Amino acid sequence: MMTRNTDAASMRAGFGFPQSLLRLGRFFPLLLLVLIFAACAPKKKSQGATSSPSLTIGAMSSMDFLPFAVAQETGIYDSLGLKLEIVHFFSANDRDAALQAGKLDGTVTDYTGAALQVAGGLDAGLVMKLDGDFSWMAYGATSEAFPSSFGVSSNTVVDFLTDRFTQPAVAKGAVVHRVEVQKIPLRLELLLQGKIGSAVLPEPFATMAEASGRCGRRDVSSAHHWEATGLLVKRELAQDGNNKALALLLQGYNLAVIKLRDADTKTLARWIKDYAGAPEKLAAHIPVPDYTPATPPKAEELQAAIAWLKQKKALKKDLTPQQLIVPMPALP
């Protein structure tokens, strides 16, 4: 008579569990690991709903971009929820190349530069004008004679303003002799040495020339209410439904304008030194523009720049002021 081993039988029977469940149990540790990793994995976020909008803009040291820098330094953009990166350039060519390569969302530039970029195929436009002064400086602090030469950078705002400043004299027969000097610091140095007779300079370089005692200020662009610079942005950033970041950028600019108006002399001088490149001893003496809230460019000022470039045969195609402007988003 064969005796049945009940322990072995129980194991073979799985204590009453079906064999299929026992086979599944072999994979339970692996299944548990998968569930643990799934629970620990970072959840994907909706880009539009939860991520902060961000922008990267280019600028050169100047007075016109100062409100953007102040808004960034004082935490205005952080409080608005905008991640802003300002990339500083020492060359307009490098700045423009970065914009064309898609490394920037926008840049502070002049109207002539914006027209050349758009005519060259860049899908961008000016969303606002900026406040910065240019001065006609001449060697010889007290001389009233028409300068023998002008340091310029061809087809730039300096070249354009040279013609605007000298137009009355040219109408009476004066001749503007141009000397190509692309970099502003070199232009200032040559002017201080008397190697060029005149130059149009932005701040703080104009005040630096005047403070030397060797140069006089003949005229300033603000006296004529001329616009010269603005914020050029990719056109897609100004489209309805996609302009939140741009709206925050301009909102922060407006709040910084208030801060600049209310700032004490010491704070204002530090900002001008840090962001406009003024020497520390002169920073408190740099004329501060009458900064205004974000305002679209004037069509007539854009038309003046376009007409001048056409006369110089510098544009690859015809442009209208409307083709140079993108709509400004609604601001609080």
Predicted region positions:
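Short, glycine-/small- and polar/acidic-enriched structural segments
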Residues: Q47-V181, L190, G197-E203, R217-D219, ...
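Pocket-lining segment of extracytoplasmic ligand-binding domains
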Residues: T112, K183-I272
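Secondary-structure end/capping motifs
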Residues: Q239-K316
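C-terminal motif of bacterial Sec signal peptides marking the signal peptidase cleavage site
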Residues: I36-A39
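Sec-dependent N-terminal signal peptides
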Residues: L30-V34
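Bacterial N-terminal signal peptides that target proteins for export
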Residues: R4-F28
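Conserved C-terminal helix/tail region of periplasmic/extracytoplasmic solute-binding proteins
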Residues: K310-P332
